[in-house]
């Protein structure tokens, strides 16, 4: 399977919260409302999405991670825990779509 990554877009959003959650977040973890959405496109036209809370997980997707993945086969990065969570999820999403299986099934597939 050849899924060459042609584009990776980072979209940062501030998710609205209920007043109760806003109050709690203001005291504890105010940055939990900030999300980074990753949109990964392949040469086959398949688009995969991933998301992360950059202040809670591994952080924002770095320029270095994008440069490492862009132009490469997305399937080669399955199981690569050095990528940030959002990019890793987008890779699983795009490979799952290419194989016509839910992304979670990729965790139990033989290599």
What do the PLM-derived regions correspond to, one by one?
Residues 7-8, 40-110:
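Metal- or metallocofactor-binding catalytic centers and their adjacent structured scaffolds
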Residues 1-49, 53:
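Structured beta-strand/loop patches that form or line metal/cofactor-binding pockets in enzymes
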